[in-house]
Structure formats: structure tokens, C-alpha cells
Amino acid sequence: MFNFLENEKYKLKEYQPLVNQINLLETSVKNYTDIELKEQFDKLRKEYFLSQNFSNDIIARSFSLTREAAFRTIGLRPFDQQLLGGLVLNSGKITEMKTGEGKTLVATLPAALNAISGRGVHIVTVNDYLAKRDSTWMGQIYDYLGLTVGLVQSQMESQERKDNYFQDITYITNSELGFDYLRDNQVKTFQEMVQRKFNYCIIDEVDAILIDEARTPLVLSIPDTIHNPKIYLDANTTAKSLIRDVDFKADEKTKNITFTDIGIDKIEYFRKIPNIYGTNAGFLFYLQNAISANIFFRKNSEYIIENNKIAIVDEFTGRVMPVRRWSNGLHEAIEAKESIDITQTSRISSSITYQNFFTLYPKLAGMTGTAKSAALELESIYNLEVVVIPTSKKFQRKDLPDKVYTNDFAKWKAIAKECFEIHKTGRPILVGTSSIEKSDFVSFLLENYKLQYNVLNARPENLKYESEIVGEAGCLNAITIATNMAGRGTDIILGGSPGFKIIRLLKILVLKVKLKEARTKKGLFLTHELYKELQKERLNYDAITQLVKFETEFGQKQIVRQKKLSTLFFYLKINYKSRFKKQKQYINQLGGLYVIGTERQDSKRIDNQLRGRAGRQGDAGSSRFFVSIEDKIFRLFGDNKFSNLFNQLNLTNEEISLESDLITKTLDNTQERVENYYYDIRKQVYDYDELITEQRKTFYLFRSKVLKTQVSGNLIIASTEDVIKKIVKSIKTPQLKFTNLTHKQENQIILEDFEQCRRIMRYALPPINLKQINASNHNVLFEFLMQEFWISYDIHKTKAFSSIGEEYYKEYERSCVLESIDHGWSTNLEKMETIRESIVWRVYAQKDPLAEYKKEGFSTFRKMDEEMKRFLVFAVFDTDFYVT
């Protein structure tokens, strides 16, 4: 521990001279008028334009100006630890700062500095709510400095996205950023692209995005030409008739399904198929998906049903992802299971992993409260060093030893009882669960104790009030049940958020309570004129919330849209300030927020995110995890240590728990095994994806060149020549395709190949019999076909020019080229995925699966070029143009 602290101090030491320099500038910066401050920032732009370098002088002045702008606009002054955090971000590293230390404000310091380059800055958050909140809140600082701020949201159209990407600083979610990148590489013209060249990116909750989400690629899909919903329904019916461990084996850890001999016999009997591995082998794929859907994917855990559609719940954030779909037919299998209309099946159009996407940025940085435990992975894969910033106040949270129970029932009973006992003291309680299903169960248990509580999970009716629920989770006697706390954004303040309480009071005063009652019951004095004016506005609660939201969350002094309401809000805030302070002190004396974890997660980082809600900014607080040996982590990765220990102690009373530092250490070791398991998976994904990354670079570069090319005719001619060469080669040597062919079969293949030529040269190629074809040698036949092609191509273009005009035809040809490229890339991705899934079996042949994958992947990519050319040629010449 001592060495770790010394190492962190050494890392921070290099930034201290700059911190001192920024502080020395503060006095002079404070004396600037608003106009002078903006002029000084403009001066930095000009200096950078000349030098193209962020010198220490420019960095210090920019940070100092941004700090002063923050204080003048939102009333917050970045302290020295926040300056350190900003400097770490600017150097392209990860800043670890505890919950409540002001990471959102920290990001403005390097963002404003890097924005002076004019090349754009992206600040990435985990959801639309945080992106909008931060862009609005922090946007006041940027606007004051003369910088423009953009916000990209999921519902925006292309032009609006483009406008926002071209601002100095853009707030956006990781998924929108990635999907826009994929879509930009499928556009038909440069004008349709919404992003510009990447420059600098700051990722909030960087470990959640670069590690937790690294296993799941971003996938753009297109509708498949084949859609057969009946097969999913049949597979679901068959799956429900099979018995686990009798008809099939299911591995919960790997999600693999394997059939027993008994199961195969039963499937063949039900399906009336003599051999399921014969021509009907494809049904097993659908059946495996159906079984997985029924046993591994649970409603209100992995997904919810929203608007009669399956909506995936993110396992790391607990949020609904309505536009996401499971791939490879799994989504359709779940729809069949839930008796929901099966949507059009899709095929991969394009994809990329976050691991490879974010490495596209020349300068990348991130911030989080829980990165140090994943420092090795972040540095080895992303070349991102983690620097821990010390807290501004002494850390006081107590992390109590875990309580381990023999079964789930005993654990949940103990959690409910613990809530009841702690609630008696008045301490606020936060109960963290891993799913909606489990949060519902905790709610049921607390109702038996007649305890009041708030629930925050993926259900839309709860998410609507997310910031209010989290903001008031620190109130006296409050109990809050929440699924995964990563990326919630709002801090839990002891005593509750003053802003949210005042909004509620405003609602009472303006909408419901008469002036006389307000004077007596609330002990407030409001002038009759002010109250009457507010009543005239006929504001509803949502309108009040909208008008004062910047005041409540961020302390802004003026609400432009409604000064009267702002005046009342400010008055209430002053009157309640001492009350909030006293309540916070009282709750601190009680012990602060008590965090209860209901199970250990796959990663210690996620557990620490939950713990981190207590003890913010020097507050008191404590945390404890309640676990059972039936929890998922022990089922999949645990050994028999705990079971043996319970047996040795002969504990007949289920309510007795094991609790000691040794047991907690054993739990930590189990969790470490889980983390290593998933790290190996992520590393494997990264290793295999390297080949796709190289292919993607080549493919996107080629596509970009085509976009820049105004005339595509030369590419079409060259492609046609290659296709004809291949056809001629096949015609003259049909045995290359198959062996042991009869003479009749050879002739049939020749005719089929020649028919391909007829499709290309329909306007010129005369009837030719087999005798003529066989009599011609390879070169003669090729030259003849090329001559016929030129004649046919001229006729084809003449008809097209007469039908749609020369310019439109050129655009048509370019569109065909791009369509063939996209089709080829999509096909290549599907083939690479098939190779990836099957290549693991090569290990049994004493071969390296990764080396074999790269070998076959190279061959597949080379074949993609041939397939693209064929697709292009037939796409162009299969179209008829009619002269009017």
C-alpha cells in the first residue's frame, strides 16, 4: 500500500509546477472584465494557430481562464485536485477521482484548452440524460469563453447531428458516437457524412465503456431477404418440451447448449425427421437459440417488454437500450418465447468494437471513480495510464466485512431485516440490486416490514424521476432500491438535494396551497404581489421543474425565462440553507448513508461504484455486502470452500451468517477469478478483432476513394474484365470446380457459365453453341467476349442517357459501386464470424486457433474482392433503361 501511494504521489508531482502557475495567474484573471476574459481566450487561439503546440504557458493560462469562467457562470471554482485531474486528462491519461469530487467540472479544463485547436473535442457519457445535462450545465462555461457547444442525442436527424459535431465541443454517448462512425462509412456522398476527423476525446465512466462493454461490438444491421417467423415458433415449442440435463446440457458460464443422445432422439421424433444432422441440421441452430432464450434470458432481468417489443437491459448500467438487438437469431428467439410479433430478421451490415473504435482518436483520455483495479488492461490495450487523484477531504467511509449465508432465502431475509434495523436509526439506506426482478423482490420484503421506499430501475415509470430519486436518497429515513449505479450522474447528498426539495415546495406554493396556508404552515413570508403573479402564469409542475432545473442542479443565479420564479426559488433557498446544513450534520452523526450490496458482481469495480455512493466529499458512510453461496458468482466460479465451511460448522440455523476478514478475502479471490475470466475473453476479442481492424482500414480507405471519384465507369470496366476472365477460365476448365464429372455435366456447367456472360452482354452477344465454345482457345474466347462487352456497354449507356440523362447515369453507376462494396463487406463480416465460431475446434488438431483464423481470414478477404466485382457487374447490367 505504501509503495502504491508513493508511486501515485510521484506521478502527480510532475503536474504540480503547472498547478502553481495556474494559481499564480488567478489574481490577475479575477480582475478581467467579461469582455477582457473572452479576449484573452481568443488570444490563446491565435497563439496556438501560430505554434500548433500546447505550451505550458498556454495550458496554464487556458486552465486559469476556464476556472474563472466556471466561477462566474455556475458558481463553482475548480480546486487544486480538480486542476490536477484536468492536467492528467490533457496528457492523454485516465483520471481516477472518487464519487462527488467533481469530474464533470474537471473535464471542462482540458476540453476548453483542446477546443482552441479548432479540430473539435468529444466528451463521451454513458447515456443521453447525462450528455444533455452536462452540455447544458457546462455549456455556460464554454459559451462565456466564446466556444460553441454541441449535443448529439439518439432521436436527432442527420443534419442536426452534423451541425452539432462541427461545434468546438460536442457531448455525446458512446453508442451514438460509434454508430455514427459506422453509418458515415456507408453513405453514398460525402455531404451525408456527419462526423469530421477525430481529434480529442474524453470518456466519462471510462472503465464501464472500455472494459465492461468491450465484449459487445456495435453492430449495424440491414433486413435479411429471408424471413421465416414460423421456424422460431417451432423451435420455441420444441425447446419447451425438452428437459435440462436429460435432453440437453446447458453451461451457464459459456451459454453453450449441447444435446444428449436422448435429446436428439426426442427432437427427431417430434420433428418427424430421420436424421437431424442431415439436411435439417439448420434447425438445431434455431433450437439452441430457443433453449438459451428460455433458460438464460429472463424477463425483468436481461430484458423488459416495452410497447410490445423486447428491450434489452444493459447488464452494467441497468438502463434500457431500446434500439439494441441481440444478433444471430437470439432476439427473434426471445420474441417467440414471449409470444411477441417476430421482427424482420437482419444481417450484419457493419460492426466495430469499442476497443478498436476509441483507438482511432489521436488523443484519448478518460475519467472514472474506479479505474485503478483495471489499470493493467487499460494500459496494455489502450495505452492509457491511470492516475489516482487524492480526495479534497479526508475519506471516512467504512466498508464492513461481507455477510455470507447458506442460501438465497436466508440472505434476502437478512437484507430486509437489516433495512428495518438501520431505518430505526434514521440513516438513509441505498440497496443495490443487479436486476429489476431482484429490486421487485426487495420491495416486496420491505413492504412486509411496512417500510416506505423509492425504486430506481430500468422501468420507464421509474427512470422518469431518476435524478429526483437519487438526489433525495440521502434524506433522513430514506430507503432507495436501485439497479446498477454506474452512470447515474447525480450525487447522493446527505439530507437530500436542496434543489429537489425546493421544487417540491414550489409546487405546493404555486399550485396547491393558498398564500395564508403558506405563511403559517411553512413559516415563510411571500409578498402578495409575487404570489399573485406566479398564479397568473398557470404553471404546472413539469413547467416549474423545467424553469428552475439549472438553479436546482447547478446553482445558476438567473433563470432567463422566468425571473419571478427564480426570485422565489432564491428566497426559499436562502431560508432553507441552514435547515439543510443542520440535517446533513445530523445524518453525518448518525453514520451517513448505509449502502447494502445484495450480491457480488462480476467485477470489483462495479461493487466499488455502489460503495462509492457513500462517504462522498468527507461525509460519513458505510457499506456491506450480503451474499449467499447460491449467488451467480459462486455457482459459476466458486469452489466448495464455503459449502465445506458451513458443513464443518454444522450450522443448522440458516439465519446465521459467516463474517470475517478472511471470508471477505476469499470472496475477493473468487471475484478476481471472474475478472480474470472476462479479461481473457476481452483479450481474445481484441486479438481476433485485430485482423478485422486491418481489413476495415483497407475497406474504408477504398470506399473513401470511391466517394471522392466522380466517374465510376473505369472501375466497372475493370471489374467486368476480371469477371469475364474468371468465367472464361471456368468455361475452359470446368473440372476446376468439381472432380469426377461426366461429359454431360461438364457441358451443363459451361452453358451455365456462358449464361452469366449473356447477362452482362445482353445487347450484343449472339447465340453460340457448345461446339463453337469448345473450339475456341482461352485467349480467343476472352477477346471475343470483351469485344461483345464493349458493344453491349455502349448500347447500355446510350439507352440510359436517353432514359435518365448522363449525370444521373453516372450517379447510378457510382451508387452500384458503393452498393457492391457494402455488400462485399457485409458478406465478409458474416463469413469471418462463421470462421471465428468454428475455428476453436482446431485446437484439438494441435493447431493455434488464432493463427488459423488469420490465415482463413486473409483468404476470405481476398475472395471478397472477387465477390464485390461480380455483384457490381451484375447490378449494373441487370438493370433495364427504357427510352421514352
From Swiss-Prot:
Membrane topology listed for this record: Peripheral membrane protein
Keyword Ribosomal protein: no
Keyword Thylakoid: yes
SUPFAM superfamilies found in the cross-reference section: Helical scaffold and wing domains of SecA, P-loop containing nucleoside triphosphate hydrolases, Pre-protein crosslinking domain of SecA
GO CC entries: chloroplast stroma; chloroplast thylakoid membrane
Positions of ATP binding: 82, 100-104, 491
CDD domains: DEXDc_SecA, SF2_C_secA
Catalytic function, reaction form: ATP + H2O + cellular proteinSide 1 = ADP + phosphate + cellular proteinSide 2
UniProt-listed Enzyme Commission number(s): 7.4.2.8
GO MF annotation, one: protein-exporting ATPase activity
Primary localisation category: plastid
Pfam families assigned to the protein according to its UniProt record, in alphabetical order: P-loop_SecA, SecA_DEAD, SecA_PP_bind, SecA_SW
Keywords attached to this entry: ATP-binding, Chloroplast, Membrane, Nucleotide-binding, Plastid, Protein transport, Thylakoid, Translocase, Translocation, Transport
InterPro entries assigned: Helicase_ATP-bd, P-loop_NTPase, SecA, SecA_CS, SecA_DEAD, SecA_motor_DEAD, SecA_preprotein_X-link_dom, SecA_SF2_C
Subcellular location: Plastid, Chloroplast stroma; Plastid, Chloroplast thylakoid membrane
GO biological process: intracellular protein transmembrane transport; protein import; protein targeting
Protein role: Has a central role in coupling the hydrolysis of ATP to the transfer of proteins across the thylakoid membrane.
Family membership noted in the UniProt record: Belongs to the SecA family.
HAMAP family reported for this sequence: SecA
UniProt name for this protein: Protein translocase subunit SecA
